[in-house]
Amino acid sequence: MTPRVWLFDLDNTLHDAGRWVFARMNGEMTRYVQQTLGVDTAEADRLRREYWQRYGSTLLGLMRHHGVRAAHFLHETHRFEGLEQNVLGHRHDLAAIARLRGRRVVLTNAPRAYALRVLGALRATTLFDEVIAIEDMTMFHQLRPKPDRRMLRHVAQRLGVAPHQCVLVEDAPENLRAAREIGMPGVWMQRFARRGAHAGPRVARWSQRLAGVRVVRGLARLDALR
């Protein structure tokens, strides 16, 4: 059965965020932690990494332990002067997305303004029916970004489909694992993965833990999925 809804991650799925964006994002987050908490650069970087590892998001750790407001954090850490000139996608991937039947939705832990800038730079805004950004991931007064399973169920419900009628296309295996646990099929996008010495074993290890998740180097064959 052809999926009724395609859910696409943004960074490192639709474009190569590792090429320019992530280094600047990490720097901006470290600077934000330093200025907000009044700590030195080394401690700020340590906290950024610790919260990301513990909660899946630096923001969640800052909200939980330091009362940081999400809107302020997202605005200050995602401004990125020169972003549009440094967004690099792949034309074959975008052409493949255009061929897909069913609704096409961007599902990103990034803020909406940033997501729209990236899509605009890719000339891909019209390819998608909707953008679900981190601002849309609050449930019961708590922010629940990917890989929160409750949020993924809520997204499917909001779109009027069951989880098994969606396909999540992602570069992050932890998000794909959460999707699988609620019955949502997944595609692990590898085009923009950084190929270090341990990349092969990492892919093999996660592939074993993600039974049923298809691993692809590009999106050209998505329309063949059933």
Regions found by a protein language model. Give the residues of each.
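Hydrophobic residues in well-ordered beta-strands that form the structural core
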Residues: D16, V106-T108, W188
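Short glycine/serine/threonine/alanine-rich loop segments
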Residues: V39, V68, G102, V161, ...
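Residue-level marker of regulatory loop/turn positions in helix-turn-helix DNA-binding domains and
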Residues: G89, L107, R144
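N-terminal helical cap/lid subdomain that shapes the substrate entry/recognition surface
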Residues: T2-D93, A113
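Short helix-to-loop capping/linker segments positioned immediately adjacent to catalytic or ligand/cofactor-binding
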Residues: Q85, R104-V106, F140
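Catalytic-core regions built around general acid/base machinery
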Residues: H92-R101
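Asp-based, Mg2+/Mn2+-dependent phosphohydrolase catalytic module
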Residues: M1-R4, A98, P111-R112, L116-R226
